[in-house]
Amino acid sequence: MSEVVAETARRRTFAIISHPDAGKTTLTEKLLLFGGAIQMAGSVKSRKAVRHATSDWMTLEKERGISVTSSVMQFPYEGKIINLLDTPGHADFGEDTYRVLTAVDSALMVIDVAKGVEERTIKLMEVCRLRDTPIMTFINKLDREGKNPIELLDEVERVLGIQCAPVTWPIGMGKRLRGVVNLLTNEVHLYEPGRNFTRQDSIIFTSLEAPGLAERIGEQMLADLHEELELIQGASACFDPTEYLGGRQTPVFFGSGVNNFGVQPLLDFFVEHAPSPQQRDTTSRVVLPTEEKLTGFVFKIQANMDPQHRDRVAFMRVCSGRFTAGMKAFHVRSSKDLKLANALTFMASDRESVAEAFPGDVIGIHNHGRVSIGDTFTEGEVLSFTGIPSFAPELFRRACLGDPLKLKQLQKGLTQLSEEGATQFFRPLMSNDLILGAVGMLQFDVVAYRLKNEYGVDATFEPVSITTARWVYCDNSKTLEEFREKNVTNLAVDASGELVYLAPTRVNLQLAQERAPEIHFFATREHAYAVGVD
């Protein structure tokens, strides 16, 4: 067996998704804690907390207690290498989350036991369904009162359209929480609130008939549990690995992330059943992870991960072959070889140099503006991985500068921050305006904050009469030039130099499309097609 095949089989690359405040970042911390990657988990609840979550590394995230960027973390567990991608729960950063989901092989969905399936969860589930991504579910905050577990499973099946297969089942809830029972092994894990956020090994009884269990949880609760389990085992599906890997069934776990409870069974089950790196589609062929030659694609760019050096890092998912430090790789979009020196692996913002990487791993490449989201790297073959889109923004603002002498820094900041993909930067052909597009208001706050803290620029964003944007293409260059001349007041270029139509109203866009039927107007821009691969 080749080294690439063996190492690929060890990898598990997944993302954690949820509605905001379901406890996703806290659960991320606890998975790292149980995986031995960190010694003490940070509380993300209080702004004044002494510790902050490992995955919420940006200053703004620590102040607000929310995740607005995606973090990448790698740790070993039970002979496997786990690559965990934490994603922003906030709806305004959905595009970042969408692209992260293109870089993983499975997902873990976190649901608040009191709130059930929420709006953001539904949207993320739709994205996962597009790719048939296998999903495990963790129903969180069991230490609080919440919905009836049976009703909750029914809600997940009804609203999300995926079959539930409970693997653990709660014994009580809120103040009456006593533990969970593993339906596959019959083991009972008793609940003990976490102390000092360190790893807790829960007390385990080998079965519901084990001596001493009734004394610990109470005779009546044990009797109620037997009754409930009879009902759930008759009404719900048993775990089927084939259905799970096909994205049609989700194994369900119950627990309390903040109390370290229910995390261990989840992690053990995940390592055993989650898929190793899968094959990937390109515009020309399917790439198998076990191929010996390196391929990979960039799904994220992060500016200023190290405030001391004002760096930009491109996050690349390795799809096949083996990466070695300092190797040259073919950058398909530019048709040039780039030396991938000083590549990094991550624990949120803590980075260390990586000597080698295999399929499923995510590495950071230092980027001086040459690498963009969606770019493919190979060992010479012209390939382009598909499914990494840019979406048309829904909100637009004009950047206004307090100090005109800082214009250069403002342009640099807007360009670099837009490379991350959460916002888009447009320059109208007929004016000197600097237009920023986003899908949510929070993104403008984040950009203003980062411009000030990372680029020393005080900027505000004022409304502008733009309703929507469309990328415009035409195979006939003469026709495109004629369209450009007639519509120059509505045209701009994005940070990649692509032509974009900025429509003041929906009616204006409709008229423009009717008047130029040979011009293609796109609401999304597939990065793969920007490299000229047919």
UniProtKB/Swiss-Prot annotation:
Transmembrane segments: none annotated. Residues 9-278 form the tr-type G domain. GTP binds at residues 18-25, 86-90, 140-143. SUPFAM superfamilies: EF-G C-terminal domain-like (SSF54980), P-loop containing nucleoside triphosphate hydrolases (SSF52540), Translation proteins (SSF50447). Pfam families: EF-G_D2, GTP_EFTU, RF3_C. Its main location: cytoplasm. Disulfide bonds: none annotated. GO terms for cellular component: cytosol. It is found in: Cytoplasm. One of its GO terms (biological process) is regulation of translational termination. Increases the formation of ribosomal termination complexes and stimulates activities of RF-1 and RF-2. It binds guanine nucleotides and has strong preference for UGA stop codons. It may interact directly with the ribosome. The stimulation of RF-1 and RF-2 is significantly reduced by GTP and GDP, but not by GMP. Belongs to the TRAFAC class translation factor GTPase superfamily. Classic translation factor GTPase family. PrfC subfamily. This is Peptide chain release factor 3. It comes from Xylella fastidiosa (strain Temecula1 / ATCC 700964).
